[in-house]
Every structure is written in C-alpha cells, then in structure tokens.
Amino acid sequence: SLFGQEFINIANGKRSYTVNVGYDYVDVRDLCTTAINCVEKGESKQNYIVGGNYIDFVGIGEVMSKKLNKQLIKGTLPFFFVYLSLPSSYLQALFFNKPRSATIDSIHTVKVQNKLIPSKLAKEILSHRPRPVDETINDTVEFFQKRGLIK
C-alpha cells in the first residue's frame, strides 16, 4: 500500500522532513474483532463508526525512533509543501507506472478530516477497544523488519 511504503520510508530515514498531518488509525486486529462482535452483538440496520487513535507523522516518527534507536524526523514543513508535491507525484506515477502518492483529493481529505472519531456506539455495543497506536506502530515495524524492508 502507499501508506505501507511511506511507513517503510520513514523507518529507513528517507523522510527526514514531513508535513505535520495525520490520521485516525485503527489497528486491523481491532477492526476484525469489532466486525465479529458486530455479527454477534450488533443491531439490525444500525451503522457503527469504528475509530482508533489519531496520530500525525511526527508522532509516528517519534514512536519509530524509540523502537529503532535512531532519530528519524528532523523537522516539519509548512502545509503548502503538500501542494508543491503534486507535480512531482504526478510525474513519478507517470514515469514509474505507480500510483500517485498525493492527489488534490488526498490533500483535501487531510485538511477537512475529523481528528476525533468517538466510536461511542461501537464501544458501548460492540465492545470496540482500540489498542494504543504505539503498539500498532511497533508491531508494524517488527512486521516489516522480519521481511527485510526496514533495516
């Protein structure tokens, strides 16, 4: 995935500077448990919003830095740098026949996202309990290390 590759790039020191944006991350293990609980405990025709924990790229870099014992993120750039990356993202996709790493839609999503996804119903009815995002990041680092993708 594009995010998986960015994760690897950060861990390998290829993204020393970042724009300080983030997302609400849900560990797939927690999502699967909640999906099973939905089948068993969920109410018919009820929708459940399942959130995790918000963390930005600087926070991800800090967790990885502790895990890998090296400083990964050296600084942040202003948000407008994301817009400046659009032409190079397009050209890289064109020349290397890979998906674009940034689009105007992905930038819009980051700008207008809700950083707090409460998941109240999922927690109350489906026993949704998102694990700490640090645990997810550390487990993901180990996963990629075992495959030789993080050195």
What are these regions (language model features)?
Residues 1-24:
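NAD(P)-dependent short-chain dehydrogenase/reductase
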Residues 19-22, 48, 110, 124:
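Conserved short-loop catalytic and cofactor-binding motifs
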Residues 20-23, 28, 32-36, 40:
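C-terminal helical subdomain
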Residues 22-23, 99-104:
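Short coil/turn segments at secondary-structure boundaries
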Residues 25, 54, 116:
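Short aromatic/basic micro-patch
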Residues 34-101, 124-125, 132-151:
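Mid/C-terminal beta-alpha module of Rossmann-like enzyme folds, strongest
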Residues 57, 102-118:
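Active-site loop of classical SDR/Rossmann-like NAD(P)-dependent oxidoreductases
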Residues 114-118, 122, 127-132:
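Internal helix-turn-beta structural module
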